[in-house]
Design a protein with these regions (language model features):
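Short Lys/Arg-enriched helix C-cap and helix-to-coil transition segments
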Residues: 34-41
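Short, solvent-exposed alpha-helical "recognition" segments
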Residues: 27-34
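Short intrinsically disordered terminal tails
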Residues: 1, 78-82
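Exposed aromatic-hydrophobic patches
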Residues: 44
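A short, Lys/Arg-enriched interface patch at domain edges and termini
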Residues: 49-79
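Polyanion-binding surface elements
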Residues: 1-26, 50, 54-57
Length: 82
């Protein structure tokens, strides 16, 4: 499992601006970043690839919001299985 920084996340989506990712987060269409330092955030690579695959598959915004909720829930279970 890797942690991707914002430039890598933008590249995965083809976005040019930071705001496009943060707007997607506010809309519930992307997971929130995880703290990797006092001021640094990153995104688990499997979350980014899962969300990109959902977009490619033509999933609706409602489906993607449900997927985002499931990915956030999965984060809490990761520690229990480690």
């Amino acid at each position: 499992m890797l942690i991707l920084r914002l430039p890598e996340v933008k590249r995965a989506y083809g976005h040019k601006s930071d705001a496009s990712i943060y707007n997607a987060i506010r809309a519930g269409l992307h997971t929130t970043g995880v703290a990797i330092g006092q001021r640094a955030r990153g995104w688990p690579d499997y979350e980014v690839s899962t969300l990109v695959a959902a977009r490619i598959a033509g999933k609706s915004d409602a489906d993607i919001r449900a997927l985002v909720n499931a990915l956030h829930a999965k984060r809490t279970g990761l520690l229990a299985t480690a």
